[in-house]
Amino acid sequence: MTQGPTDTHKGLSWIADAYDIGFTLTLGEGLSPHELLRGVGAEEHRIVPLSCSAASELLLRDEEDHIGDLDFLDREDEAAVARLTDGGFLPTPPDAIVRAGAVAGWAYALEEFSCHTGEHIAALSRRGRALCVHRSAAGFSRVDYALRGEAVTSFEPGLPHLTNGVPAEEALGFTHDGDEAGDVAFLRFLEDRFGISIPWEETEAELPSAAFT
C-alpha cells in the first residue's frame, strides 16, 4: 500500500516515497494507456479498472484467502468478480499488476514491487521515447531507455560502470554525483527535462489495469 506524499502534485519524485518497498515507473511517448498495456502483453478484454489500494490488496493476498476479505470488492457483485477472474486477478494472486494512465503526450504505467514493463521498453518506444525506472525491494535501481524501437541504454544511476549501452550522459544528458538516491535523482531529472508531472491523487484512483503471472 502506498503512502501519500507531502506534496501530491509535484513532478515524479514523490513516487519513490509513496512506493517505498519497490516500484516501476514506465513512460511511453505518443501512446494511450490501453496501447501501453497491450504493448506489454495485455489482452484488451482482460483490462480492468483498479485503484491503487485495490491493486495492492490483490497482490498481497494469498490464494487461500476468501474474496470476501477484499475491502474494495462486493462479493455479491458477480459481474465484478467475473471481470477480475477473467482478467487474471483472481483466484491466484498475479505476479504483477500494471496500472496505466496518460499525461502530456505520454502514457505512464506504475507497478508496485514488480518490473514487468521493463522487458518491453523497446516495443513501447515505437512512436518516440520510452523509459523505465525500477527500484527493487532490496533498494537497487535501474533505468532503461529506448528510442523508436531500439534499446539505447540500461544503467544504474550513480554507477556508470554498470551501464549496458550508451552512457547515460550521452544518451539522455543525465549525470548523478550527489547524495540523493539515484532513482530519485533520475525522477527529478525527468521532471525537469521532459516537464512530466503525475498527480498522486490520479494514481490512487481507478486506472486501466492488467494482471500478469
Language model features with spans:
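Long, compositionally biased intrinsically disordered terminal regions
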Residues: 2-12, 136-213
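Hydrophobic alpha-helical segments that drive targeting, anchoring, or assembly
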Residues: 4-160
